[in-house]
Design a protein with these regions (language model features):
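Transmembrane signal-anchor hairpin modules in multi-pass inner-membrane enzymes, especially those
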Residues: 1-90, 107-121, 178-194, 235-239
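Interfacial juxtamembrane loops and adjacent helix segments
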Residues: 145-151, 266-280, 305-307
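Extracytoplasmic catalytic/substrate-binding loops of multi-pass membrane glycan-assembly enzymes
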Residues: 37, 96-97, 274-287, 298-307
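Extracytoplasmic loop-helix module adjacent to an early transmembrane segment
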Residues: 42-46, 282-297
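A membrane-periplasm/extracellular boundary helix in multi-pass inner-membrane enzymes
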Residues: 117, 209-210, 230-275, 288-296, ...
Length: 307
């Protein structure tokens, strides 16, 4: 234990760099791919330096590391023998940084366990900003920076990139997992419990208002899984989902345009008297193509970015 404290004091600047970059990730993801990719690269390089300096070999000899290295080797071999090796290797070779990033997070949890609670707070603040700005844009037609809503679809700080729903639906599992890991801090206090309830409901409604049908499907699918499989939190998710659906029903009753895009158009695209589709004809064609590629390359696949 004393050796870990010694390492932390000796390398405080580098550990704090990793710490703050991880806390800023929820915000940097809103800006686009460049800043989060740069952050992950800096975190990975910093951890490599700490690994060499402090001989952190245990992290690299774990079962997780061995599994990843096998996966990484197979991934690059697949890229090498793919239809366009150069294009595929551009993706598979740099994938290694995500492995180092995961090890850096693992290391940080060991030397600074409070990172999990701090990351949860960071995600909550980021989601609150997006949610408040999103509802502001929905009501007034523009967000607090004056960026106008695109048609009826809410995008908040993503501007003309209509991915607000995708962001919320994909960060939600991390958010809820961290809530469970910090159970004593959040679920034993009524204010935080109410805050989580509002966040869950707001994420559902705002994903609907973003007009992203796939994201809305994911968020509802995760809600159903949580309600069915969770023991301690199913009532919280059930009531937050019910409240969100009531709000969505109210919104669609006032403005039927939202219902037409998310519900009516989806039902229309899923099938007609002649042919039935999975979500839409475009989705179905993607699934058929993916299945054919799988049947032709069952063991290795066709390589990253070769779809």
């Amino acid at each position: 234990m004393s050796s870990k404290i010694g390492i932390y004091k000796k390398d405080k600047i580098f550990i704090n760099l990793i710490y703050f970059l991880i806390l800023l990730l929820p915000f940097s993801l809103v800006t686009g791919p460049f800043i989060p990719d740069l952050s992950i690269t800096i975190i990975a390089l910093t951890f490599i330096y700490l690994s060499i300096k402090n001989n952190l070999r245990d992290f690299y000899t774990s079962n997780y590391s061995k599994f990843f290295l096998i996966f990484y080797l197979v991934l690059n071999l697949t890229s090498f023998f793919s239809h366009d090796p150069i294009q595929s290797l551009k993706i598979s070779l740099v994938y290694f940084r995500y492995f180092i990033f995961a090890l850096a997070v693992w290391y940080l949890i060991k030397v600074k366990p409070g990172i999990l609670l701090s990351l949860l707070k960071s995600i909550i603040i980021c989601m609150l900003i997006l949610i408040l700005d999103g509802f502001y844009q929905f009501y007034f037609g523009e967000n607090i920076l004056g960026w106008e809503r695109i048609g009826t679809r809410v995008s908040s700080f993503f501007r003309d990139e209509l991915i607000l729903g995708s962001y919320l639906s994909r960060i939600f599992p991390i958010f809820f997992s961290l809530c469970i890991l910090n159970f004593k801090y959040f679920f034993n206090k009524k204010f935080y419990l109410f805050l989580i309830f509002l966040l869950l409901s707001s994420i559902e409604v705002l994903t609907f208002l973003s007009g992203e049908r796939a994201a809305f499907f994911y968020i509802n699918l995760s809600a159903i899984f949580l309600i069915i499989m969770m023991k301690d939190f199913k009532l919280l998710r059930f009531f937050s989902l019910s409240f969100a659906l009531i709000l969505i029903f109210t919104i669609t009753s006032i403005n039927s345009i939202y219902k037409e895009r998310i519900i009516d158009q989806t039902i229309k695209q899923m099938g007609s008297q002649e042919q039935t589709f999975i979500f839409s004809q475009e989705h179905t064609n993607h699934y058929i193509s993916a299945f054919k590629m799988f049947t032709n390359n069952k063991v290795t696949g066709i390589g990253p970015r070769m779809f």
